[in-house]
């Protein structure tokens, strides 16, 4: 049994970087199911890999532009319940799949995904009118990665706000918390958490985002990422910043009218 446990730890240590990503390929929905006009986007990144995304066109007089980064077990299609309604409210919505997700090529890993997200932001920035900025929004892992990307982006002058939704504050901490809930992996939570790359730790970057406004949206009943992550991020952030507490499970955040209105109320506070 001891030998088996050691082999199990070695296996997870060699593959832990991929624990962050659970690629989803299938598309249950496309924007036309919600009567939204959209365009397919294909970006070729530095190493020749092609990344796929959608631009959902504002359904009424355009208010602004949002780029949305999904979590680790989703793709642009499965996250449509959290995004399509913003196009209905007047936002051009850009959504992209990470490597290995949806129609995107390549193999998912943290370094490449962080780099690809910056390229996606640059793609949008180059197409915005001079007077317009984009809002960067990320859910779960997408929000945590977006903290680092926005803090270090070469396109900060084109970013109006960062909005994180159910994001975590530390890669080591969330890894330990997730493993601690598994009877099989409970005993290995301490060594395995250090196998995850923490170079892009959100707590180290969120204080660098100012003067770009940051909104941290989190449910106090999130069953996967605890509310303490949001509080830690809020404490580490510098003004202007907002902590917005909602009532939701982890995934289906904006399926309710109340939570949609909460987000829309924040969006209305941003200067145009």
What do these predicted ranges mean?
Residues 108-128:
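Alpha/beta-hydrolase active-site loop
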Residues 82, 202, 226-235:
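Short alpha-helix in the alpha/beta-hydrolase fold that links the catalytic acid
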Residues 148-204, 255:
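Hydrolase active-site cap/lid region
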Residues 249-258:
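Catalytic histidine-centered segment of alpha/beta-hydrolase-like enzymes
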Residues 12-45, 49-54:
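An N-terminal hydrophobic leader/cap segment in hydrolases
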Residues 83-105:
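Conserved alpha/beta-hydrolase
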């Amino acid at each position: 049994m001891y030998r088996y446990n050691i082999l199990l730890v070695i296996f997870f240590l060699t593959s832990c970087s991929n624990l962050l990503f659970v690629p989803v390929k299938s598309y249950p929905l496309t924007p036309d199911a919600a009567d939204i006009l959209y365009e397919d986007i294909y970006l070729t990144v530095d190493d020749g890999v092609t990344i796929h995304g959608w631009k959902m066109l504002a359904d009424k007089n355009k208010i602004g532009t949002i780029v949305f980064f999904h979590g680790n077990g989703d793709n642009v299609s499965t996250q449509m319940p959290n995004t399509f309604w913003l196009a209905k409210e007047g936002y051009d919505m850009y959504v992209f799949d990470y490597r290995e997700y949806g129609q995107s090529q390549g193999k998912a890993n943290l370094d490449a995904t962080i780099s690809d997200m910056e390229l996606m932001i640059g793609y949008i920035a180059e197409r915005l009118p001079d007077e317009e900025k984009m809002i960067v929004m990320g859910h779960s892992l997408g929000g945590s990665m977006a903290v680092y990307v926005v803090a270090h982006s070469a396109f900060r002058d084109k970013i109006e706000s960062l909005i994180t939704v159910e994001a975590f504050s530390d890669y080591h901490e969330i890894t330990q918390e997730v493993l601690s809930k598994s009877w099989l992996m409970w005993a290995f939570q301490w060594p395995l958490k250090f196998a995850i790359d923490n170079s892009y730790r959100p707590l180290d970057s969120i204080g660098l985002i100012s003067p770009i406004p940051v909104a941290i949206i989190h449910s106090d009943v999130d069953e996967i990422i605890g509310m303490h992550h949001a509080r830690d991020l809020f404490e580490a952030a510098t003004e202007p910043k907002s902590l917005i507490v909602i009532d939701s499970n982890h995934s289906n955040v904006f399926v309710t009218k109340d939570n949609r209105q909460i987000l829309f109320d924040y969006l209305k506070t941003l200067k145009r």
